[in-house]
């Protein structure tokens, strides 16, 4: 297999099954653009998508109940989906399966730290030179299996680091704790978070990061007058608020 040329420089959303996948629905409903959407496992049964990443063999879903609640959804997907579904082996019962390019990925990045399906999807995006990666539902907050949560998150963040070092823009759902995204800005820098005037990081319009004291940061948003909704939206014209552009 060769990298997919049409993905070079494009914006791709990877959607997993964590709680922050609801942020994907919010993003879509407010016009956020994705050139492609990649579904992780059973998310493919819920949202529109262009590709599925399912690194478990199809037999796990077709011949056992080992996948728990995902089993029925994934069995249906495996039997009926036309693909592409990237996985570890082909199965005659499943028309859409494509073998993941594991040889090419390991050779390209000289790395085989791949302990979960999301990491494989990120590595694939990096291999295809995707320009922007937006992650939703990639949370690794499994209370019943903390070891899996910690090891999976570590692997995903490792690959995100590799992607960012190669120039890829990475964005994480606001409600996800991946890359400490949901942590308040003045609590992200360990040690400095204990100071009376903690350090915060802000990005300029060129996406260059700068360090400020919290006291230096001034909000550019003016306080808006509180308004009540009416059926003619006359208050929006009066206060020049209009429909929000950012959420």
Language-model features and meaning:
Residues 1-247:
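Metal-ion/cofactor- or nucleotide/acyl-coenzyme-handling active-site neighborhoods
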